[in-house]
């Protein structure tokens, strides 16, 4: 065990959560700045139409991957924490073996499907044969995306420092690459290549670091013991949990990808680029929401299992801090968004101001809901959380189609804000009606 793990275990639960979150947010803060600069340089170099085309290429690959992503990271944490706390390396090793197998199979399947479907999906989004070739080439990076188990291993052993560094890799590559591409007035294929290399590299780094951690803590303890026969059925409830987190992950990600491609289909690549730009800027809040879930889930699971009152403290205080931070960004966008977009990106992107404000509001609501969702998972109510997000996603997609058709891009932002409030309200009611002594675990 390293010094990082020793020192974190000595902290009270809330301080440990904040310490781990700070480790990640330092990396994410630098990454967010570089990602924004890279996006801004690409937008300035290519213009709205070709910028939107790169966005559609990336979104297509992410959409296909999301369809086959079983989000094994949460399974490793949910079922790995008890084994880790009891130093049961055999059970932990078998769990990781099962989850790794799922990662490998799903990433290979996603790559094959993306390559097969690309010639048909590309033209429907306004792509010519050249763009379709770029779309197929970009799809190959999906082979590197089976990283759920790797992320779970690093979270299990409190290596949030590694996760923090990993988050800076893709933005750094894109930042450096975009500077050179902007300086040389590069073509669209150069930017597609930069984005693909960055995306693959960050995944390969995580796989490498998790392998080192696995070899140190688990493989050595399993010397002479075979785990090749590990099966999904060895873990009670794991199959159900994976299906729940699969659908939950899709409910989080797929609507965003679907709506981006729908805007490209209905309004054109330029408008799809503006929507993606607003999402990229609102990721200043949506990405911390993901980080909070990564950091907080381990401690919430442990405190719920132990029946500690720290469970409520961690969940509610983190939600309040997230809400206060998010509102600052919403107000900044409302009052200064037009000036900032015009200065940083150019006047042709000022039209994204209104949708940006709504997307930041939706991201703020998601930021508040993020620790509550981890609490729901820790309590054993993952299926109930998923049902809330099914309702939210249904509302979002219906409102998106209706409001975008009538109001344009601003309708997409309004739909996102209304839908984001649904799971927040539902999870608050669910948590308030349950106490640690009623744990389902």
Task: Identify what each model region corresponds to.
Residues 15-77, 111, 115, 243-270, ...:
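Signature of the first transmembrane helix
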Residues 19-35, 57, 66-119, 128, ...:
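Membrane-water interface segments that mark the loop-to-transmembrane alpha-helix transition
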Residues 39-63, 131, 188-193, 233-245, ...:
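Interfacial/gating helices of multi-pass transporter permease domains
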């Amino acid at each position: 065990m390293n010094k990082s793990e020793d020192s974190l275990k000595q902290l009270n639960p809330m301080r440990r959560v904040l310490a781990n979150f700070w480790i990640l947010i330092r990396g994410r803060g630098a990454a967010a700045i570089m990602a924004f600069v890279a996006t801004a340089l690409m937008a300035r170099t290519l213009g709205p139409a070709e910028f939107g085309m790169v966005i559609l290429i990336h979104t297509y690959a992410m959409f296909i991957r999301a369809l086959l992503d079983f989000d094994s990271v949460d399974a490793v944490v949910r079922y790995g924490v008890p084994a880790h706390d009891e130093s049961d390396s055999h059970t932990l090793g078998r769990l990781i073996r099962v989850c790794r197998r799922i990662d490998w199979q799903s990433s290979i399947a996603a790559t094959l499907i993306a390559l097969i479907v690309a010639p048909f999906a590309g033209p429907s989004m306004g792509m010519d044969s050249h763009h379709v070739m770029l779309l197929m080439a970009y799809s190959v990076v999906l082979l590197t995306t089976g990283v759920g188990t790797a992320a779970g291993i690093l979270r299990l052993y409190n290596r949030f420092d590694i996760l923090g560094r990993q988050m800076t890799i893709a933005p750094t590559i894109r930042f450096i690459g975009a500077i050179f591409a902007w300086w040389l007035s590069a073509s669209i294929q150069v930017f597609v290549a930069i984005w693909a290399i960055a995306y693959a590299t960050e995944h390969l780094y995580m796989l490498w670091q998790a392998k080192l951690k696995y070899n140190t803590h688990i493989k050595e303890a399993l010397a002479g013991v075979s785990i090749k026969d590990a099966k999904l059925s060895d873990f009670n409830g794991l199959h159900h949990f994976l299906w729940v987190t699969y659908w939950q992950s899709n409910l989080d990600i797929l609507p965003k990808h679907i709506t981006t491609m729908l805007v490209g289909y209905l309004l054109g690549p330029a408008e799809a680029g503006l929507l993606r730009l607003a999402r990229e800027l609102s990721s200043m809040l949506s990405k911390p929401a993901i980080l909070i879930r990564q950091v907080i889930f381990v401690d919430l699971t442990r405190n719920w299992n132990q029946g500690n009152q720290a469970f409520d403290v961690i969940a509610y205080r983190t939600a309040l801090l997230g809400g206060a931070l998010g509102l600052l960004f919403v107000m900044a966008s409302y009052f200064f968004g037009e000036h900032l977009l015009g200065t940083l990106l150019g006047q042709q992107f000022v039209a994204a101001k209104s949708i940006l404000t709504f997307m930041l509001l939706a991201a703020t609501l998601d930021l508040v809901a993020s620790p509550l969702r981890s609490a729901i998972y820790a309590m054993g109510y993952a299926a109930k959380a998923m049902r809330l997000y099914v309702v939210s996603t249904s509302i979002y997609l219906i409102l998106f189609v209706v409001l975008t058709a009538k109001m344009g891009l601003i309708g997409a932002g309004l739909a996102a804000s209304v839908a984001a409030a649904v799971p927040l309200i539902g999870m608050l009611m669910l948590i308030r009606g349950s106490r640690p002594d009623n744990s389902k675990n």
